Amino acid sequence: MRVILYSKSDCHLCDAFHFELLDLQSELGFAYEQRYLQKGDPLFAEFSGHFPLVDIETSATQPTRLIDLTSQRQLRTEIKQAAGLAALMQAI
């Protein structure tokens, strides 16, 4: 499983999600990357108003899920569900 956090500067929730994802990464063992977007970046305009965004890829054959979350509890739930799905897909 691979998780990408899309962040911007001066985003306290982005920072909180980053540290939550680091904790979850050590617990569940997924690949994690944080990408900072800035004004002028094509994705910044597309995602404007929707930070932080989390991109979860459970397997190479499954499409990624880009989700807009509003709490660390929501983030933890989504990541644990995705990790369970990724483990199930590996077993198949």
Residue ranges of predicted features:
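Non-catalytic, surface beta->alpha helical segment in thiol-disulfide oxidoreductase systems
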Residues: 56-91
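Thiol-based oxidoreductase modules, predominantly thioredoxin-like and allied folds used
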Residues: 29-41
